């Protein structure tokens, strides 16, 4: 029959449909279009390259024709290369590319493996060939190959000990007693027996995925057990649920007991600004795995349903701010500072630890979300009252995703489906069409039972029949028709370890879900939805899921059981215009929204002070030391920094690589001490003959003495190796009247070391530069001197040249060293404002004395001052 077909086609091979398509594609790709040169334009109607006489060349027309042909040649070369070469590995878009681009050849069909190996060698890609497959290995004990070797070894040992011919063939020193044959046989038998019998200590799970609830009740929970292959890597730093996915696409960092995402490998500074900034410029969303934020669930054991004892504890932790009616009864998420207290020592809530989120589920139940650096400290504080409270450590049992952007809710709605009719889910579907989240009420929380996100073959938007325009009445109904009972029921399931364990019951594997989807695809009726696996209430698990709005940071968090996060994460990142971010991008968003980022912008806390004075300082100093002598700044030889040069310091003041809050504390306390009783402030004392009094204590009579004392304290700290965690030099000012004692009352006979005993009250500010330049981290903030105020006010209005342009080359007056009032903790160019902007802290006493809100900002290692205007940031 094949012969007849060949004869009918002239002896040529009959090509199938795919071969014909490929041949036509290559033929079209290799065809090059060209413009024909016409001698006259009358016949063709097109402009000719030649003149009417035919002897001259139209240069313009000739160049345009050749330009067209060169472009067609380049296009044909590109198309021909792409059409004729078929790669085994896909050329993915940049967003989906992995960092290392390594491939496992075993996952490729056998007929393509040799070609894949050639491609990988050509492109210097890593191949995975060594190692055995884990699919054939049993759950416990030996695999089939090891079991066969053990049984064969027993038979050979028995044969060698009984066979006379084998004994004679062996050397005389090799005997059964010398080789301990019996002991080896017993050991092999024991190994086979242990492999065949099940371990009675193993707790059987309710699913085949290995998911379980890892909660510590009144104790810290252990790191969740995953694959044995990765256990050793998580000994000190636990992995988040999305670690393997993120490790291929992001730069990771190890801090605070976790391996977290620092930043994606792709450049995303402007992208983060557009999507995470204003709603008008956002056409997508950003997502971040925020499971490193630890979750504590606190319940009041007392029979009182009002939870008065829990209310008192939360009040002490948050300075009574989280106990307001809006948060406790209205179910609005509280974002603020958390404080440490110890009732035994009689300490009050004056030492802030860091930021926290508090959500009141009911009056006797609260959820506290904390940064991992302060999690253990707060957990131990709550554990002191375990007789009256039940404290659950849910660090590894509750996961969360943070979403930000105009399309955050719309993207989330395309991945989630409710198991049954839910009023909260209906409200969520209606709200998902709103891009401006500022139009929503403050109490905007959704909770419902969701199906497995893997039931959806791909993220699918809601049907047009389900979508309708949202008006003001619909938004008002969110507050009026708030389904509190329904939401409380889901929260109770989320806060119960047994309910979380039940959510993993019959959790399907990907293979099982694919088999169910294949049955749908091969079904006869076409009316059913063949891409979404239907939910079976009797067999399929349901996920208790909560979506909470955060007002301060203007984003959304999704809280769900730990092992359910990865399926949702995979589906979220398949949505167009959805990008994953890390801690670096979250800090950028906080900076652009003029919010503080923990711990970099919290120098008044213990961890923030350590971060600035140790980690960031050492990193900057190491980077500076690596530079050659000719490429690094010599901070000690910088000239013209201040108006008056004092003998105590030459060049840059304070620490060169950090915000020297200790220097600011001593300087401001010393100035207040020198100006006590309306005394005149002197920079130097020319009549002074000695530096120390009869008791060997340095006399403080002028500003130069204060600077000399700073050097003395620094030398003493290095000699005694004092801990930097103790005696934080600054404290956040809560009220207008500072609560800390000022050094105005220091007696003359007291030690000058009292200047370090009183912390300075500081306030958080955002400083926006009015002209050129942008501040950097650790930049110095100076107050505007009274004598130069007119000059800087004129500069703020603008000094123009005769041609109408601004004059930026004016000679500016320099401030004195005692005009230093603060530091910039985070500073760069603000894309939204179009100017340089920095977040920092200034001395509260100096701020309230200023007639204007203008300050001078100078970067470290420079002598250029920029005028800026500060505004207070509420903490």
Curated annotation (Swiss-Prot):
Modified residues (Phosphothreonine): 524
Annotated Polar residues bias: 39-54
Pfam families: POP1_C, POP1_N, POPLD
The organism's place on the tree of life at top rank: Eukaryota
Entry's Gene Ontology cellular component terms: cytoplasm; nucleolar ribonuclease P complex; ribonuclease MRP complex; telomerase holoenzyme complex
GO MF: ribonuclease P activity; RNA binding
Top EC class for this record: hydrolase
Region named Disordered: 1-20, 35-54, 119-140
Xref: InterPro entries: Pop1 (IPR039182), POP1_C (IPR055079), Pop1_N (IPR009723), POPLD_dom (IPR012590)
Keyword check for Lipid biosynthesis: no
Biological processes annotated in GO: intronic box C/D snoRNA processing; maturation of 5.8S rRNA; nuclear-transcribed mRNA catabolic process, RNase MRP-dependent; rRNA processing; tRNA 5'-leader removal; tRNA processing
EC number: 3.1.26.5
Catalytic activity of the protein: Endonucleolytic cleavage of RNA, removing 5'-extranucleotides from tRNA precursor
Its biological purpose: Required for processing of 5.8S rRNA (short form) at site A3 and for 5' and 3' processing of pre-tRNA.
Note: Present with 846 molecules/cell in log phase SD medium.
UniProt xrefs under PANTHER family: RIBONUCLEASES P/MRP PROTEIN SUBUNIT POP1, RIBONUCLEASES P_MRP PROTEIN SUBUNIT POP1
Oligomer and partners: Component of nuclear RNase P and RNase MRP complexes. RNase P consists of an RNA moiety and at least 9 protein subunits including POP1, POP3, POP4, POP5, POP6, POP7, POP8, RPP1 and RPR2. RNase MRP complex consists of an RNA moiety and at least 10 protein subunits including POP1, POP3, POP4, POP5, POP6, POP7, POP8, RMP1, RPP1 and SNM1, many of which are shared with the RNase P complex.
Protein name from the UniProt record: Ribonucleases P/MRP protein subunit POP1
Lineage, broadest ranks: Eukaryota, Fungi, Dikarya, Ascomycota, Saccharomycotina
